């Protein structure tokens, strides 16, 4: 069976989009394709002017590193690294110099209200603080597109809404933000809702 079937979708720069659907509907697969973590077996996918489906593995890796930041449901933080060290990882991968890394990280941590948590391990932080660390890590490389897979799924309602407000603020700064959620209340906080069922797009609020 196909995870996605006959999906046709265009997302403009600067949109704030929710991809909504039940578990197993194909929404996470769609996010992985958008994020260059998975390749469709048929059809084409363009990111800006690059045809990702025809690009080499190294080109796709470069696109992913330069253009995309990820936020996951269970934070995906390294348990034995401090908050600061977790946020530093993508900058190390990009060979950013130490002094510049420090400047970027501290600026993001201050902006997200987690500067006082910088030397803490993830296990010593609340879920909301851990998700803020994950968001900071997604932002430090100045990615154009932020992808968030169930970013509020492991949080209580109040903290989940705070995280969504943060993503909204990030979107207003000019970044494209795409979230996957099964929560209608969360989806309604975005500007556009795409609904997926059994691998097909069955609703797009932009077309109303």
Give the residues covered by each predicted segment.
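H-loop (His-switch) and adjacent beta-strand-loop-beta switch element
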Residues: 193-205
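ABC family nucleotide-binding domain
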Residues: 1-196
